[in-house]
């Protein structure tokens, strides 16, 4: 059983789509999507780096199609909002360099047995023959403290980041620029229930002529009050809005960016463990991505079934081997069934072999760019297959049967 804690604080952060690292994630996933539109069976491992006036796209891509990578890069940057040189980065004038190789033959031989990717028609033996593209461990998590079954600190942080972008793009606060960060500290009570917002930190890039006082007043009214439930705010809640006083130089001009450097923002805000693998730019044969999605799918269905208040699932793989080398379930003392029973139910109801995950979640589609900002999990704005709770009823039914016997 979990040890009782006193009242305590927990903090998570998010970033806007204009953050340098997030620009890279979106470019990598935009390239992946563009390839998958024409070649669903492509192997893609696409890394991006940005700095002042420069984008470098590198990686390993094996495909039978052609994609105009510089065009995809420029469209993505334009969509984010870097459209003028005075923003420090401009979609039309930045240099775009590419260095793309094919996937290593040594890796390919372990996963190539179904390059035609007939997951829908494959026999069990054929699925078994497709090994994982790498070794590694992945975690999935869910908790019933929010409607989307995500921890509240990361949930609110993402909503604030998204709202910063909304008010910039719709003209409500036209002086905002694309780069920004948010952070939310939540106070939990002795029962690990979130009770109030302790601290909110917002930092946003802005036009040079705007005063700090105006930014602070506008962000409190148009961002914080529009997103954070008033019931969670009290007179003790602390606000730090652009606490350095000025944030004019931002984006790739302010900091270099890299794909895969916001893995905690992408997942659970540090509330759950992380296996270390990044998501963006990787096709679904990479278990770093598909395994983490499957683990979230499993954990969310366990919580949605009422079998635990919170649940963390760990999966681990060996390169070239289809079956996970381990499956672990941790319910932190909140489980309504024993954890070993839950592991057996997971094995029964979820096909966690790489080709099985691809088939189960239909992952050969161009659905990834939309995940590259504002989190891969707990999304209510886009229909992501690993967020479905379609296995919850069957899990609950099996537990009831076991209890009856």
From Swiss-Prot:
InterPro entries: ADOMET_SYNTHASE_CS, S-AdoMet_synt_C, S-AdoMet_synt_central, S-AdoMet_synt_N, S-AdoMet_synthetase, S-AdoMet_synthetase_sfam. It catalyses: L-methionine + ATP + H2O = S-adenosyl-L-methionine + phosphate + diphosphate. Residues 103-113 are annotated as: Flexible loop. Pathway: Amino-acid biosynthesis; S-adenosyl-L-methionine biosynthesis; S-adenosyl-L-methionine from L-methionine: step 1/1. The keyword Nucleus does not apply. Its EC number is 2.5.1.6. Keywords: ATP-binding, Cytoplasm, Magnesium, Metal-binding, Nucleotide-binding, One-carbon metabolism, Potassium, Transferase. It is found in: Cytoplasm. Its cofactor is Mg(2+); K(+). L-methionine binds at residues 60, 103, 255, 286. Binds 2 divalent ions per subunit. Binds 1 potassium ion per subunit. Mg(2+) binds at residue 21. It holds the Pfam family S-AdoMet_synt_C. One of its GO terms (cellular component) is cytoplasm. The keyword Magnesium applies. ATP binds at residues 19, 179-181, 246-247, 255, 261-262, 278, 282. K(+) binds at residue 47. GO terms for biological process: one-carbon metabolic process; S-adenosylmethionine biosynthetic process. One of its GO terms (molecular function) is ATP binding. Belongs to the AdoMet synthase family. Catalyzes the formation of S-adenosylmethionine (AdoMet) from methionine and ATP. The overall synthetic reaction is composed of two sequential steps, AdoMet formation and the subsequent tripolyphosphate hydrolysis which occurs prior to release of AdoMet from the enzyme. This is S-adenosylmethionine synthase. The lineage of its organism: Bacteria, Bacillati, Bacillota, Bacilli, Bacillales.
């Amino acid at each position: 059983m979990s040890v009782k804690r006193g009242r305590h604080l927990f903090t998570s952060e998010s970033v806007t789509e204009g953050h340098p690292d997030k620009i890279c994630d979106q470019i990598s996933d935009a390239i992946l999507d563009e390839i998958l539109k024409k070649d669903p069976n492509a192997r893609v491992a696409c890394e991006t780096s940005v700095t002042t006036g420069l984008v470098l796209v590198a990686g390993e891509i094996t495909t039978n199609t052609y994609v105009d990578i510089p065009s995809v890069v420029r469209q993505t940057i334009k969509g984010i909002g870097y459209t003028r040189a005075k923003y420090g980065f401009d979609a039309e004038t930045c240099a775009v360099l590419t260095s793309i190789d094919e996937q290593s033959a040594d890796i390919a031989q372990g996963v190539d047995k179904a390059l035609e990717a007939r997951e829908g028609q494959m026999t069990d033996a054929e699925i078994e023959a497709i090994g994982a593209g790498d070794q590694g461990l992945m975690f999935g998590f869910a908790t019933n403290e929010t409607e989307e079954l995500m921890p509240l600190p990361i949930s609110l942080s993402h909503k604030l980041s998204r709202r910063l972008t909304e008010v910039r793009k719709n003209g409500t606060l036209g002086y905002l620029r694309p780069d920004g960060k948010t952070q939310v500290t939540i106070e939990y009570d002795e029962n690990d229930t979130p009770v109030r917002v302790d601290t909110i930190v917002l930092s946003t890039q802005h036009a040079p002529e705007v005063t700090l006082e105006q930014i602070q007043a506008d962000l409190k009214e148009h961002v914080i009050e529009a997103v954070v439930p008033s019931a969670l705010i009290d007179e003790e809640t602390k606000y730090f809005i652009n606490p350095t006083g000025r944030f004019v130089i931002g984006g790739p001009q302010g900091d270099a960016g890299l794909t895969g450097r916001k893995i905690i923002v992408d997942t659970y805000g540090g509330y759950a463990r992380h296996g270390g693998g990044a998501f963006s730019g990787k096709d679904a044969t990479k278990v770093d991505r598909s395994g983490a999605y499957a683990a979230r799918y499993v954990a969310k269905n366990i919580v949605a079934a009422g079998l635990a208040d919170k649940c963390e699932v760990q999966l681990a793989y060996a390169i070239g081997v289809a079956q996970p080398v381990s499956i672990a379930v941790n319910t932190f003392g909140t489980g309504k069934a024993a954890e070993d029973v839950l592991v057996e139910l997971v094995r029964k109801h979820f096909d966690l072999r790489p080709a099985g995950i691809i088939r189960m979640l239909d992952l050969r589609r161009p659905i990834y760019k939309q995940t590259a900002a504002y989190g891969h999990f707990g999304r209510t704005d886009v229909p992501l297959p690993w967020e479905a709770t379609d296995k919850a009823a069957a899990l609950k039914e099996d537990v009831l049967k076991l209890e009856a016997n």
